[in-house]
Regions:
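Accessory beta->alpha helical hairpin/"wing" motif in late/C-terminal subdomains of nucleic-acid enzymes
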Residues: 298-301
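Short, solvent-exposed loop/turn and secondary-structure capping segments
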Residues: 48, 76-80, 121-123, 163-167, ...
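Serine-esterase "nucleophile elbow" of acetyl-processing enzymes
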Residues: 48-115
Length: 317
């Protein structure tokens, strides 16, 4: 293989390498100009008085919506296997979704406990909380964020007389409910006193009364209709007592009992089902077929009704 000959580069005459003083001055000036131009491109933008007047964007301060209560405060619904589970579709989530667009810094804190009673909310024993109970955790949160809480909602008391539903007759049912109701009302008074003291003035607290799952008994013939009618009278009395406690503490009431038309046994034209029973079946899982039903928790549409009732009562909608 023949070697490749690399041509020799031409040699510039020595005279061409020399520069005059004037030439060097011009070259130096050009280099300085180039450096200055590069510095101008990579350096800070020139001052603009109009832009200087625009303040930096402010991050909105965090405010809070505190949701307290039982399983409804956690959006509990039955899953496909019929197991009651917490969901992100409860009334608290829907209230938060309605409030947040106009309040970018708003945060939702849910402390509700499925199965909670007024007594366990005070003393603990069902769900685990720092401080031992839901009420202690709520008080600690309100004290730590005083002046930054927009809204507190509460649903509690439905589970207190719930065990009375297992009584063998109407007489026993009524006696059981009458026995349990005064204690629940007293406990609610304690809860509200402590919440109001921790929250301070100006915080909106809205308590909820309840719809009545026992209305579903109406569908089981005459005996069931008597149970539904009797249960509605007891529920109306109980909800009125809860309402008086809320009003005495300065809280507002979300009238879910009324929103579900619980007291209305009239039958709309062309139907054989009372309006209150139809609403219960429409907005809860109580009338659903197994495995999801019967389940007393609200469905998504029912939680939407409850959320709307809370918003109207709060005055924030």
């Amino acid at each position: 293989m023949r070697p490749v000959r690399i041509p020799r580069l031409p040699r510039f005459p020595r005279a061409a390498a020399r520069t005059t003083t004037a030439a060097r001055t011009v070259t130096a000036a050009a280099v300085v100009a180039v450096i200055a131009a590069l510095t101008a491109c990579s350096g800070p933008a020139p001052s603009n008085p109009a832009l200087a007047k625009i303040p930096p964007a402010k991050v909105p301060p965090a405010t809070y919506y505190l949701a307290l209560g039982d399983s409804l405060a956690q959006g509990v619904q039955p899953n496909a296997a019929g197991v009651s589970v917490m969901t992100p579709d409860g009334y608290a989530d829907q209230v938060y979704a309605a409030l947040r667009p106009s309040r970018p810094g708003l945060k939702l804190v849910k402390l509700g406990c499925p199965g909670e009673t007024t007594a366990s909310m005070i003393n603990g024993g069902i769900c685990r909380y720092q401080g031992g109970s839901q009420l202690a955790a709520a008080v600690a949160f309100l004290q730590a964020h005083r002046g930054r809480v927009l809204l507190v909602t509460l649903d509690i008391g439905a589970n207190d007389p719930e065990h009375c539903g297992g009584q063998p007759g109407l007489g026993q049912l009524a006696k059981c409910a009458v026995k349990d109701i005064p204690g629940a009302v007293d406990h609610l008074g304690t809860i509200m006193t402590r919440l109001k003291a921790a929250a301070g003035p100006g915080v909106r607290i809205v308590g909820m009364n309840y719809y009545l799952p026992a209305l579903a008994e109406w569908r089981s013939g005459l005996p069931g209709r008597v149970v539904a009618w009797t249960a509605e009278k007891l529920a109306a009395t109980y909800n009125a007592m809860l309402g008086r406690v809320y009003a005495k503490s300065g809280a507002r009431v979300a009238n879910v009992f009324g929103a579900f038309e619980t007291a209305d046994f009239t039958k709309p034209a062309g139907t054989n089902v009372p309006r209150n029973v139809a609403r219960l079946c429409q907005w809860t899982w109580e009338c659903a077929a197994p495995p999801r039903g019967p389940n007393q928790h609200a469905n998504q549409a029912g939680y939407q009704v409850i959320a709307r009732t809370f918003l109207q009562a709060s005055g924030l909608s």
